[in-house]
Curated annotation (Swiss-Prot):
Compositional bias per record (Polar residues), positions renumbered to this chain: 323-333
Gene Ontology cellular component terms for the protein in this record: cytoplasm; nucleus
Keyword Lyase: no
Family: Belongs to the small GTPase superfamily.
Protein name per Swiss-Prot or TrEMBL: Small GTPase LIP1
Keyword vocabulary terms for this entry: Cytoplasm, GTP-binding, Nucleotide-binding, Nucleus
Organism of derivation: Arabidopsis thaliana (Mouse-ear cress)
Keyword Cytoplasm tagged: yes
Function per UniProt: Functional small GTPase that acts as a negative factor controlling the light-dependent period shortening of circadian rhythms and light-induced phase resetting during the subjective night. May protect the clock from excessive or mistimed light. Suppresses red and blue light-mediated photomorphogenesis and is required for light-controlled inhibition of endoreplication and tolerance to salt stress. The entrainment of the circadian clock is independent from the other pleiotropic effects. Could be a regulator of seedling establishment.
Region (Disordered): 274-313, 323-342
Taxonomic lineage: Eukaryota, Viridiplantae, Streptophyta, Embryophyta, Tracheophyta
Length: 342
């Protein structure tokens, strides 16, 4: 019995769950912090020697598979995992595009803030970027409470150019930057290894975030993939989130049954106002319908009405006007001929 119950649930999930989907992630930060190099590293897995200057916005697409948490561990991989596409919108940070880059802030699922570890001012300006996106953007599956600058979607902070910062002695080390950063974040209790969700930092500037060196193809791939899967889960599998989770917001709608009762009661009141008192067939000559058809309205006529044919067994002959005129004319003609003969 349990086997059939699980099989029925898996079939239902396969029918209802989307076969594929997409989430949109903004990549914002000051000009020159390495956003284009980071997006190229995430999508291609390799560094770019001379990244071109971004004009307006550049979109990169990353393919990722996601399995529904409600799927059974014994189910086939093809049935539980589905394909999704992560759109990484690399928005130019140059001041010349300040007045028009809000065109790209639409239907946002998440934000990646990028700053340069060798230039502290680029991290300070992240607050300005958060306020700009929150004020002019539209969002998909927003959070119940906003983050920095009122940003209503999940975000993550990436400190890029850790290799340059290490050489200058500003921040970082010459060792494995990914392991060092992950160890520090887990030590601070910000990134539990057993959790699907990533920490959201409350304000800028602050300690924490991911460390990357796009030129040396170093970044925390696992953490970013968790971030992308969290966005997919919030958009396409929101019913599987815990009830008290802060990741979803849903106003309390009017239930369909309550609305149906209201409509039914209104119809009853209208029927009571327009109904006859007593038997409506008592004071006219109409024949009452069958009891089962009393409250049913006749179906609409979908074809033109045909004229009723008259039977031919009448005792009184009927003549048309033309035949009468023809008979009259024949009689007058005969009388004239008789007069002539006489």
């Amino acid at each position: 019995m349990k086997f059939w119950r699980e099989r029925e649930r898996e079939n239902k999930e396969q029918i209802l769950a989307p076969l594929c989907g997409q989430v949109r992630v903004l990549v914002v930060g000051d000009s020159g912090v390495g956003k284009t190099s980071l997006v190229h590293l995430i999508n291609k897995g390799s560094s770019i020697v001379r990244p071109p200057q971004t004009i307006g916005c550049t979109v990169g697409v990353k393919h990722i598979t996601y399995g529904s948490p409600a799927s059974s561990s014994s189910s086939i991989q093809g049935d539980s995992e589905r394909d999704f596409f992560v759109e990484l919108w690399d928005v130019s940070g140059h001041e010349r595009y300040k007045d028009c880059r809000s065109l790209f802030y639409s239907q946002i699922n998440g934000v990646i803030f990028v700053h340069d570890l060798s230039q502290r001012r680029t991290k300070t300006s992240l607050q300005k970027w958060a306020s700009e996106v929150a004020a002019t953007g539209t969002f998909s599956a927003p959070l119940p409470s906003g983050g920095p600058g009122g940003l209503p979607v999940p975000y993550i902070v990436v400190g890029n150019k850790a290799d340059i910062a290490a050489k200058e002695g500003t921040k970082g080390s010459s060792g494995n930057l990914v392991d060092a950063a992950r160890h520090w974040v887990e030590k601070q209790g910000l990134l539990p290894s057993s959790s699907e969700d990533l920490p959201l930092f409350e304000s800028f500037p602050g300690n924490g975030g991911l460390i990357a060196a796009a030129k040396e193809t170093r970044y925390d791939k696992e953490a970013l993939n968790k971030f992308f899967r969290m966005l997919i889960r919030r958009r396409y599998f929101s019913d599987e989130l815990p009830a008290a989770s802060p990741w979803s917001i849903s106003p309390v709608p009017t239930s369909s049954s309550q609305r149906l009762d209201e409509i039914t009661s209104d119809d009853d009141q209208f029927y009571k106002r327009t109904s006859f008192h007593g038997d409506p067939y008592k004071y006219n000559n109409t024949i009452p319908p069958l009891p089962a058809q009393r409250n049913l309205t006749p179906p609409p006529t979908l074809y033109p009405q045909q004229p009723v044919s008259t039977p031919d067994n009448y005792t009184i002959p009927r003549y048309s006007l033309s035949s009468v005129q023809e008979t009259t004319n024949n009689g007058s003609a005969r009388s004239k001929r008789m007069d002539i003969n006489v």
